[in-house]
Amino acid sequence: MARRLATASLAVLAAAATALTAPTPAAAAPPGAKDVTAVLFEWKFASVARACTDSLGPAGYGYVQVSPPQEHIQGSQWWTSYQPVSYKIAGRLGDRAAFKSMVDTCHAAGVKVVADSVINHMAAGSGTGTGGSAYQKYDYPGIWSGADMDDCRSEINDYGNRANVQNCELVGLADLDTGEPYVRDRIAAYLNDLLLLGVDGFRIDAAKHMPAADLTAIKAKVGNGSTYWKQEAIHGAGEAVQPSEYLGTGDVQEFRYARDLKRVFQNENLAHLKNFGEDWGYMASGKSAVFVDNHDTERGGDTLNYKNGSAYTLAGVFMLAWPYGSPDVHSGYEFTDHDAGPPNGGTVNACYSDGWKCQHAWPELSSMVGLRNTASGQPVTNWWDNGGDQIAFGRGDKAYVAINHEGSALNRTFQSGLPGGAYCDVQSGRSVTVGSDGTFTATVAAGTALALHTGARTCSGGGTGPGTGQTSASFHVNATTAWGENIYVTGDQAALGNWDPARALKLDPAAYPVWKLDVPLAAGTPFQYKYLRKDAAGKAVWESGANRTATVGTTGALTLNDTWRG
């Protein structure tokens, strides 16, 4: 490994790192019931701030994770954010003032902030960074020189060799020698600076490429040593470095969880999920961070992503309902090019526009955050499955969820542990009555879910269900279809997908050829809508004619009786 002589600058840097220590560090793991993180991938800080106020706080998210804030190489590709040039807060997503404003705004909304932190390596190539800093590989003036890099100056090529994985270069990026005291102190100074700006924790990028002992030593210099860390350590069977090595430093992302969800939802039966978690060989629940997809896996294809339709949505519903790990809800943007950077340079003018997917705000997912918070600490109870892709389970006496991943409606009497009374199905906005014995009868349309919890007793105010003034539009359309086709509706409201065919809502064919769906909408809302059909491959065909129009009444549900226009 490289060695650097002790100098006066080292002493000064170490002192600076100590001086920067934040007085109030975050806890070692997400505390309390609010353990869900919204990962707003490549969102500008100003847009993150608005999301904290408008959607994340009200939905009950505990954390928001922001993309790497440090200065990086020039370029529009998303991965430029992961090639640091300096530790100035001067990337494409915003400057230091914008970052601080975002943190303060999110805190005011009750949302803590996690910063994606790139500390394993520096940029390759040469040029001028986004903050004006000149650099070339191995030389980053005022920060690093070649003496601070590992001696291996070639790319990683053998994941069965620990030294190769941790001392050589990840895709040719300059590998920092994190075993050296100066390097540890300088990295800690950067993280402590983020703490002083109000950050509550860190996602450590490429943790697997740094020895666990090095990360432990760095963390000891950050805050008071108990700051929340979530580490990226990808599992690979038979590899020399395993994710479990990092459990002593903080939480570790359990990549097998997401891979297995894809396999089960696409090729197996949901009934297999009955003991999902540690019984599958995963790391301990209390130390694991889980996700359906992240920015790498959605592009690499080893997990589900937004292109997988209801399978993706229902996997998210399951993750948020199931008591394993601390969930990350990835919220990114549409892509066809693997390298494409964020629309508008990261500015989100509105969800579901300009390619922004806003998964964190999808009603099917955001409604489950409140359920998860309500059911925190409750065990899985009253499991039911049909042996295939229809499952249901309770969370003690606090919640109950049913998921229908089949092509026909699920209609049955469910046994829950819920107290008797009225509940709002936060997935559909419909009222459900639970008997004194915990049973209730309901229909769950194909490709949808049902979710009840004690924090949402009514659909017209109270709890965490739809708020005061909420009613619904009941869509009924007579439409004949070919085998494999389904009918959807979309329109100019967020609840209707904002004209995005990928976010269109699937109607229930239980009364075929009449397709039905109830959608919660605020009383008095005027809206436009239109029906479309999708085949098994997801190809969409719109009905003909102009946009349909309607207005929700001030009381009661609006019923629409339509006929498909060929």
Swiss-Prot record:
This protein's UniProt keywords: Calcium, Carbohydrate metabolism, Glycosidase, Hydrolase, Metal-binding, Signal
GO annotation, biological process: carbohydrate metabolic process
Active site location: 205, 232
Binding site for Ca(2+): 120, 166, 175, 209
Transmembrane segment boundaries: none
Required cofactor(s): Ca(2+)
Record site: Transition state stabilizer: 296
Residue ranges occupied by any CBM20 domain in the UniProt entry: 465-566
Residues spanning the signal sequence: 1-28
Cofactor-binding details, from the entry: Binds 1 Ca(2+) ion per subunit.
SMART domains: Aamy (SM00642), Aamy_C (SM00632), CBM_2 (SM01065)
GO MF term list: alpha-amylase activity; metal ion binding; starch binding
Catalytic activity, reaction form: Endohydrolysis of (1->4)-alpha-D-glucosidic linkages in polysaccharides containing three or more (1->4)-alpha-linked D-glucose units
Superkingdom in the source lineage: Bacteria
Pfam assignment, any one: CBM_20
Protein EC: 3.2.1.1
Family stated for the protein in its record: Belongs to the glycosyl hydrolase 13 family.
Record note on quaternary structure: Monomer.
PANTHER family listed in its UniProt record: ALPHA-AMYLASE (PTHR43447)
Protein name per Swiss-Prot or TrEMBL: Alpha-amylase
Gene: amy
